[in-house]
């Protein structure tokens, strides 16, 4: 119902992480990272599957040891979502997980050894068609750059990133994406802006170590929102000191808010006041939990009175406008029914599920007609 945002995406090259296209206009991929011990195969698999259920396109797994690499082999066999192996210092781990079917390597070429070891990893990645993510972080800048700049700056992060890019360029390897993360919003944003002007490769966005569920979501929404609104970014991760599942939910909420990528229900709800005719807050909270399984994109407005309710309902897939004892239900901008305020949650859940099924069937028919 609402128009898509007129955001002009930055042009970038195309790579694939497993079967997920990255860059060159592909949908912005949302990813997270496991926080289990990788050697605990069962716990890690369970967490990855939980991330899959809420829509994760890609999942990163830390592989710090050879034991973790052996566990990675077993994990990879039990999940469907593409996996990125996060590797530092030991090039042999990168070679090992490449044998085990890793979909992407997250490394910094500068910290896995000498030129020959870098070449071995890159040659292996090329032979097995595995992309690489260069991950620069303000908290782990090279010592000489810390001394040169005195502190992490956008120019320092850019210089670090370009060093790693140059490593891959010298080896004639172009299947990579880059990130320049920082916990400071403005440092991260300016670093990405500078990098976006220097290279054509896809960019992975993130505000690193953003904080807990609430503060981290706010920082990420501001930082990623600024970049995405400028067309910068091909994949993203919302880094939270919280359940990784929340990272995926917040990531999609950011994309939905910018009308870049829709997944599931976009709830539009008033903050409530004394004019509300039913429990708006309780209704929204209950429906968000009950309807997490719905992936059909739709706007649902839940407004407690007639001041703004009708206007929001006009541009929503489904909309409720609070009234005395009964509230008006709108579908595609047209008033269709009245719902009992005392049974609002159950009635609205039923209507939303029915509408989702209707929209899914309509899209299925459209696809079949196109294929004919």
UniProtKB/Swiss-Prot annotation:
Domain of life from the UniProt record: Bacteria
Protein name listed in UniProt: 4-hydroxy-3-methylbut-2-en-1-yl diphosphate synthase (flavodoxin)
Chain positions recorded as [4Fe-4S] cluster binding sites: 270, 273, 305, 312
Organism: Salmonella typhimurium (strain LT2 / SGSC1412 / ATCC 700720)
Chemical reaction(s) catalysed: (2E)-4-hydroxy-3-methylbut-2-enyl diphosphate + oxidized [flavodoxin] + H2O + 2 H(+) = 2-C-methyl-D-erythritol 2,4-cyclic diphosphate + reduced [flavodoxin]
EC number: 1.17.7.3
NCBIfam families the record matches: ispG_gcpE, PRK00366.1
GO MF term set: 4 iron, 4 sulfur cluster binding; 4-hydroxy-3-methylbut-2-en-1-yl diphosphate synthase activity (ferredoxin); 4-hydroxy-3-methylbut-2-enyl-diphosphate synthase activity (flavodoxin); iron ion binding
Alphabetic keyword roster: 4Fe-4S, Iron, Iron-sulfur, Isoprene biosynthesis, Metal-binding, Oxidoreductase
Pathway it works in: Isoprenoid biosynthesis; isopentenyl diphosphate biosynthesis via DXP pathway; isopentenyl diphosphate from 1-deoxy-D-xylulose 5-phosphate: step 5/6
Family: Belongs to the IspG family.
